Every structure is written in structure tokens, then in C-alpha cells.
A protein has these predicted regions:
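A short, N-terminal "cap"/entry segment at the start of jelly-roll beta-barrel domains
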Residues: 1-37, 51-52, 118-151
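Short beta-strand His + acidic residue motifs that chelate non-heme Fe in jelly-roll/DSBH
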Residues: 51-53, 71-72, 88, 94-100, ...
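A short beta-to-alpha transition loop/helix N-cap that caps and shapes the active-site region
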Residues: 104, 114-120
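Short acidic-glycine-tyrosine-enriched beta hairpin
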Residues: 75-90
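Short, surface-exposed secondary-structure boundary micro-motifs
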Residues: 91-92, 111
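Structural motif
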Residues: 48, 61, 68-70, 77, ...
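Short, conserved beta-strand element in jelly-roll/cupin
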Residues: 36, 41-46, 55-71, 109-111
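Short acidic/proline- and small/hydrophobic-mixed sequence motifs that coincide with surface turns
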Residues: 34, 103-104
Length: 151
């Protein structure tokens, strides 16, 4: 099997309404495909770019490369900064918000591989809303992005 290389500089990725861009490094439209995990690079815009409150069947890790943000996981809320990683168990609601003045950059890895519903839900404006269709966010957390996509 020949070596396959994914070059972040050539992967366009997708921009989401919650002010982030996701570039698949393994899975999705990446030249690298795996059956046991997916991995990608995410840039959250300053002052509120977000991976909104959601859950998924896969276990996942976020590794923060640069920036500062708020990580919510179940009933917990914490500040997270570059150089830190957080484990996200399957089916646990979670949210990451950039609270800094510069872009936050992170890598996610989850398994098994496959698309996750929250990507489509966010693009369609159908994400379950915290406290209504989903558990409430931890006390004091940044609000969940629920604005519909701009047409």
C-alpha cells in the first residue's frame, strides 16, 4: 500500500455557523481514511467561536494547540489552554468555546470513524438546545450557539 499524506494547507475544510472551521485529516474528504478513528484540525474564531453543546456515540479527545477557552463536559466547566487535552466519553454532552482574543486551534480524534450528527445538525440549524432538547449547560457556561446558518 503506498504512503498517503494529508496536507493541512490543501484541505479546504468546512466553516460552521458557530464560527469555526474544521479540516478533516483522517476521514471525511481527507485522502487518509481509517475505520477505527477520525481526526481533524479545528480553528475557533476569537471571542466566542465554538463547538456547540452536543453529544455523540464515539469517545473523543480534544488536544488544544493554541489559545484559551472554556470546556464544558457533562456538569463540569473548566478553562483549557494550549498544550492540554481533554477526554470526552461516549454520549456525554460537551462544548468548547474560544474565550480568547486570538484564534484557538485544536485537534480532535474520535473512534470509531464516521461522520457525527452534530456537524449536519449545526449546518441545518437543528442542534438539540441546551436545557430544552438536551441537558443544561454547567452553571456559568458560555451560551450554546443556536443561531441558524446564514443563507
Amino acid at each position: 500500500m503506498p504512503m498517503t499524506i494529508a496536507d493541512l494547507r490543501t484541505i479546504t475544510g468546512r466553516t460552521y455557523p458557530a464560527r469555526r472551521r474544521t479540516q478533516n485529516l483522517v476521514g471525511g474528504l481527507s485522502p487518509i481514511q481509517a475505520s477505527n478513528f477520525s481526526m481533524g484540525f479545528v480553528t475557533l474564531e476569537p471571542h466566542g467561536g465554538q463547538v456547540p453543546w452536543h453529544n455523540q456515540e464515539q469517545e473523543e479527545v480534544y488536544f488544544i494547540l493554541e489559545g484559551k477557552g472554556e470546556m464544558c463536559l457533562g456538569a463540569e466547566r473548566s478553562t483549557i489552554v494550549g498544550g492540554q487535552a481533554v477526554f470526552i466519553p461516549p454520549r456525554v454532552f460537551h462544548q468548547l468555546t474560544n474565550t480568547g482574543a486570538t484564534p484557538m486551534k485544536m485537534i480532535y480524534c474520535y473512534g470509531p470513524a464516521g461522520d457525527v450528527a452534530h456537524w449536519r445538525q449545526e449546518l441545518e440549524g437543528t442542534l438539540p438546545r441546551a436545557g430544552t432538547d438536551a441537558p443544561t449547560l454547567p452553571e456559568g457556561a458560555q451560551p450554546q450557539w443556536t443561531e441558524p446558518p446564514q443563507s
